[in-house]
């Protein structure tokens, strides 16, 4: 896993975990995934939530279950998808609730990086899944 993407503050928070056996095992399994076991999101996006949201800027955590498991659907932020993807029902529901509750249509793209850059940590409880298999790494 590419932990170099993490903000410096997250690295100092997590660095003790990086040397523990459980983390090394997870890291080894992710790095050894063959093309037959593609991960969602792509390996370079596994820690994207910690890349886009700095710890000192953190305002709120929105927790999802696991990444979308469709091909090129998950981008590393919970509920977010790349702009070229169809809006999934869960994200559509979030946008609908914001509109209904605040009488305001969210001015953000489906990739939700605008929110992440403002201190919204969009984190899934499971950072990866196997392509095509929901809850496969729970």
What are these regions (language model features)?
Residues 1-14:
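Generic N-terminal amphipathic, Lys/Arg-enriched alpha-helix
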Residues 16-138:
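A polyanion-binding, active-site-adjacent surface
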């Amino acid at each position: 896993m590419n932990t170099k993407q993490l903000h410096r503050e997250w690295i100092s928070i997590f660095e003790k975990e990086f040397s523990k056996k459980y983390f090394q095992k997870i890291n080894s399994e992710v790095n050894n995934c063959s093309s037959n076991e593609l991960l969602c999101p792509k390996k370079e996006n596994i820690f994207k939530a910690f890349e886009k949201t700095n710890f000192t800027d953190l305002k709120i955590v929105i927790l999802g279950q696991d990444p979308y498991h469709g091909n090129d659907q998950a981008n590393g932020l919970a509920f977010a998808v790349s702009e070229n993807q169809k809006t999934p029902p869960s994200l559509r529901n979030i946008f609908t609730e914001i509109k209904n509750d605040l009488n305001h249509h969210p001015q953000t793209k489906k990739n939700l990086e605008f929110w992440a850059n403002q201190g919204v940590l969009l984190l899934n409880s499971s950072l990866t899944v196997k392509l095509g298999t929901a809850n496969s790494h729970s």
